[in-house]
Amino acid sequence: MIRVSQLKLPVEHSEEQFYQKIEKSLKIKRDQIKKLQIVKKSIDARKKPEVSIVYSVDVWVDKEEKILKHSGNKNAVCVKEKKYKVPEHGTERFNHRPVVIGAGPAGLFCAYLLAREGYRPLVFERGKKVVERTEDVLHFWKTGVLNPASNVQFGEGGAGTFSDGKLNTLVKDPLGRNRFVLDTFVSFGAPEKITYENKPHIGTDILSKVIAAMREEILHLGGTFEFESCVTDIRVENQKIKAVEINHNTWMETEVCVLALGHSARDTFEMLQKTGLFMEPKAFAVGFRVEHPQKDINRSQYGEKYAELLEAAPYKVTANLANGRGVYSFCMCPGGYVVNASSEEKRLAVNGMSYSDRGSKNANSAIIVSVTPDDFDGTDALSGVEFQRRLEEKAFALGNGKIPQQLFGDYCENKKSTGYGTFSSETRGETAFSNLRGLFSDEMEQSFIEGMHSFAKHIPEFDRKDAIISGVESRTSSPVRIRRDEVFEANIRGIYPCGEGAGYAGGITSAAMDGMKVAEAVIRKYQPFK
């Protein structure tokens, strides 16, 4: 096939214009095209007020080399179709079924691959099925009554279920895992456009249905799910995993235990540390969730002409400060909501979430400051966890259990806000005005303020006085890394640390890909379970 890149078209182009552009770029006729597939679609707004839609497409034709040479198009190349392949099965035999702990993206894709290959995985998830979990989350947002086992962090689908459902990743994977993840989501009900959009997203509403469909297929392939089943202990003999304990009362023997815990399984981290599993603190970032009117972000990113024609605009900002810290946007949610993402009593964390239509009137993003083990006395593997907890306890107290909020101008002046400015907050969960100064160290607070002013150089009025900040954004990534070797095993053999909670991914797609890598390691070593 021939891949043609840099196909620029007007924002409001027709399908006929799209085909004509391809025909002209390769100097071919319509009937010569046997098959066509969009590889990438993005918005180019670098030369506002002119904005273009830019495509890369794969075109299947006869006599590819001849057509390519005749076209003289420097943006066209012959490429081979790349399909993901599962490795050959190993020779060792299982005595017991492989266990996967956690049904987030890493655990689900690990289980899916194992199930497809006949390994009959047994998945334990501390939370509930996605439909019941959603009911618990909505109840929490309405009443403030938290279920510590079923919330924004815990339950089928993982923390990403209540986010924007972003699927972009910076991970380059020559083996095609990234495309496999996207194609799998599409096969279970996600829109096909996620396979080619530059910044694909599903949205919480659709992702929930996709996750449930994926679970049903894993069950059909011989896998098993046990919900409301928290791993409370493990049995180790001769530095090998022998069994896992569920809910303090049931032991399940296994030789393979995939730890796809998620970044908020703090009690499980504590339990694992006591067993001698090697883990270490890692750098992460903390800050606030910041809201602006989406129409203003659209105008800044697209220009006045296209601000209302195009989809809700995303942004990405970053600054490296003189004090050595980085300040940057994270998990930006166009047309999104700030949500109460707490999972522990008397502690409060926030996150951002969008539905598939990104229809909220506000844009929000975490604006976060980098922290290292030096900031939280990182001598103990779980020191980052305790750092997070202290911040979340402060945030809970500041809002009396509600999301504490403040206008950016008041934050700079170190005074409590008493009302919104020209726009109000879009949240899921109750809110309360507070003074968020004192939540972080002086240096980190000044870094946040300096970063906000710096970003205003790129996005006008990013540092507007009535920008709404909500605290605390503390769960940006895992504060822990569970060490693993080149075959993905921990120092306790048979344990496979996996995904974001183990410190090897950041976001839905990279976590899913890491789940696949761990499944591949198990497949290379063992025969399917019989």
Region roles according to the model:
Residues 3-53, 57-184, 188-530:
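Residues forming the flavin
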